[in-house]
């Protein structure tokens, strides 16, 4: 009898789970910001010609608040 179960087990192959597609997000699913804290303001007068946005001050403020670490580039164009 155990020989029967051994042979049966060799024929049964577990199928891999199909990958679930992520639901596409549209504007109607996005609500108002929650727990928003305004850290700094960057206005048109804060932009240096040819250097992009001076982000070092804002990045330091955001890092002091905690959260995800992200590398910011001063040459990034918004």
Swiss-Prot record:
Transcription regulation in keyword set: no
Lipidation, kind S-palmitoyl cysteine: residue numbers?
10-11
A Pfam family it matches? PBD
GO BP terms: namely: regulation of cell shape; regulation of Rho protein signal transduction
Q: Which InterPro entries match?
A: CRIB_dom, CRIB_dom_sf, SPEC
Which PROSITE patterns does this one have? CRIB (PS50108)
- Bilayer disposition of the protein: Lipid-anchor
GO CC, any one term = plasma membrane
Provide the alphabetized UniProt keywords.
Cell membrane, Cell shape, Cytoplasm, Cytoskeleton, Lipoprotein, Membrane, Palmitate
Gene Ontology terms for molecular function: small GTPase binding
Q: Boundaries of each CRIB domain copy? A: 30-43
UniProt-annotated location(s):
Cytoplasm, Cytoskeleton; Cell membrane
**Summary of the function given for this chain in its UniProt record:** Probably involved in the organization of the actin cytoskeleton by acting downstream of CDC42, inducing actin filament assembly.
Q: Which family does it belong to?
A: Belongs to the CDC42SE/SPEC family.
Q: List the protein's name.
A: CDC42 small effector protein 1
């Amino acid at each position: 009898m155990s020989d029967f179960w051994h042979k049966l087990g060799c024929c049964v192959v577990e199928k891999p789970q199909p990958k679930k597609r992520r639901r596409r997000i549209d504007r109607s699913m996005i609500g108002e910001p929650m727990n928003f804290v305004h850290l700094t303001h960057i206005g048109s007068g804060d932009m240096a010609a040819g250097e992009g946005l001076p982000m070092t001050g804002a990045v330091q403020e955001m890092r002091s608040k905690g959260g995800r670490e992200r590398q910011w580039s001063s040459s990034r164009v918004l």
